[in-house]
Amino acid sequence: MSHKINSKPFILHSEFKPSGDQPQAIEILAENLNDGLAHQTLLGVTGSGKTFTIANVIAKLNRPAMLLAPNKTLAAQLYAEMKAFFPENAVEYFVSYYDYYQPEAYVPSSDTFIEKDASINDQIEQMRLSATKSFLERRDTIVVASVSAIYGLGDPDSYLKMMLHLQTGAIIDQRQILVRLAELQYTRNDQAFQRGTFRVRGEIIDIFPAESDDRAVRIELFDDEIERLSLFDPLTGTGFGAVPRFTVYPKTHYVTPREQILDAIEKIKSELADRREYFIKENKLLEEQRITQRTQFDIEMMNELGYCSGIENYSRYLSGRNEGEPPPTLFDYMPSDALLVIDESHVTVPQIGGMYRGDRSRKETLVEYGFRLPSALDNRPLRFEEFERLAPQTIYVSATPGPYELEKSGTEIIDQVVRPTGLLDPEIEIRPVSIQVDDLLSEARQRADRNERVLVTTLTKRMAEDLTDYLDEHGIRVRYLHSDIDTVERVEIIRDLRLGEFDVLVGINLLREGLDIPEVSLVAILDADKEGFLRSERSLIQTIGRAARNLKGKAILYADRITNSMEKAITETNRRREKQMKYNEEHGITPQGLNKKVGELLDIGQGGSNKSRNKPRSQKAAEPATTYAIPMTAKEYQQQIKKLEQQMYKFAQDLEFEKAAAIRDQLHKLREQFVENG
């Protein structure tokens, strides 16, 4: 079936023109891509407008693109920026749609099986469906994705085959439309009209497409003919006018044509027979009973409904792939000439490499103990070498590219060191460790008096806590950025720092996202001469760069000797400073401070909720696990639920599934007790 592709050009909206190193970087990147170069690196310092450069390259080449970010927060920032640059084009967001995800797991030592438990974010699910739809329908598409893009997704061929094409004047009876909608996993709901549902009133069928958030389609039939197709707002009912044709996309990426499902069922039955034989031979009768019961239940569900819970575990059969072949992913939905941009590549590339192994070990346990068939091992993220094979022409973007990017790019490393604002990299000073705490106290006071902010990085949690208490006792408004804080709270703390709610932020790893804050004029690195991951050349350059958005930016490294990493970081920072000063001198540029507005919290994946912004916060932003008494008031109940949920998410994240499950059960009990007590 031919699929209609919309070929609208990219139209870049910006009040700025490329300046500094940007014009040259745009030119070289675009030229290399046109010449077919597979790998190149944009070495762009903090605040040099790397995103703007990439946006210009995409607009210049007029090719679809995928931007990979290392986490949801950075992906959300990139998405917001790209949406502002390309308001007339399809800018999409593709990250994991789980707010909370505990995969099914088995712990042999305690004979504990933990069912899969997940909370799916409806808004992000809609955005994922919208992203694949745009890749299939439009050339002017930019998808901003997290590493979720390398995880298995439904097969694009099956997905395309299942689409329902509607056209004014087409002959089709109402029953046929309803059957097709059920096959697409839409449910009928005449009361609550929401995403992925349809309602029927006489000869009118209203469908709320799964990938849409503000448009629904109305089919008006006359006998067995589609008399009119129109779009309307599902909330207000306001009409947007008639359309000649409309395509309804499936509600999930895992829909499969009926004949393919029947074919898959036969293969699953055959594998089940082999597995049963194996378990009986090994005298593992419990495992044999377990796999038989679970698989037969799934087969029955697939036969009756066309899907089952955990259908992705049978994706090898549903997509018709052979054992060990890579699963279909977002890369299979991309046009063949798309670009791949890997942001913060020094973090993202190693992340891609690490996803496969963790997933594999958990699934092998499930297979060994009869919870899953061996074919479930093919529902997995891509291996690194598979990712390399599938990746189109790639631009790596980082202020400190890793060894992989440097090796792949060879000589094609494009420097973007000069900032359009003329801002220089921070000055670096080295001071002795013996005076670090008192010296920091006096520096923090000076900055607070000038309404500027300070970031402090320590090596240990204990040191960070003690330093926070010490500064607090001496009248400094300080907060400690805990590693246990969830992303939303983290964004709020950073927002409060920018608004001047406090002046000093202490943390261990300040390389994480969202810390490019124009108000920060001082970065203090304690114990800078202790070699290790947090004091490596790359980490030091990144941390020093946190003060690069301020006119008076300065970095103080407290050290008694200059390590190899320090020397390299200082040399690189000074190289950049010299290049920036020379450019400013030649072009008569006076450095300008950044006046970046403090925006509202980005509500992607938060359901637009800023509810915790006004709550009083303790000095420490996360608390250790404690035992809980039965709450007496509604407020106490809410606080306790929140604490327990935070712990549960943390345990699930650390793969401590037993502990997460125990807290989940505690939550259920707590809710029941509260309801009983009225």
Curated annotation (Swiss-Prot):
One of its GO terms (biological process) is SOS response. ATP binds at residues 44-51. Residues 31-417 form the Helicase ATP-binding domain. Residues 436-602 form the Helicase C-terminal domain. Residues 638-673 form the UVR domain. InterPro entries: Helicase/UvrB_N, Helicase_ATP-bd, Helicase_C-like, P-loop_NTPase, UVR_dom, UVR_dom_sf, UvrB, UvrB_inter. Its main location: cytoplasm. The keyword DNA damage applies. The UvrABC repair system catalyzes the recognition and processing of DNA lesions. A damage recognition complex composed of 2 UvrA and 2 UvrB subunits scans DNA for abnormalities. Upon binding of the UvrA(2)B(2) complex to a putative damaged site, the DNA wraps around one UvrB monomer. DNA wrap is dependent on ATP binding by UvrB and probably causes local melting of the DNA helix, facilitating insertion of UvrB beta-hairpin between the DNA strands. Then UvrB probes one DNA strand for the presence of a lesion. Forms a heterotetramer with UvrA during the search for lesions. Interacts with UvrC in an incision complex. This is UvrABC system protein B. It comes from Mannheimia succiniciproducens (strain KCTC 0769BP / MBEL55E). The lineage of its organism: Bacteria, Pseudomonadati, Pseudomonadota, Gammaproteobacteria, Pasteurellales.
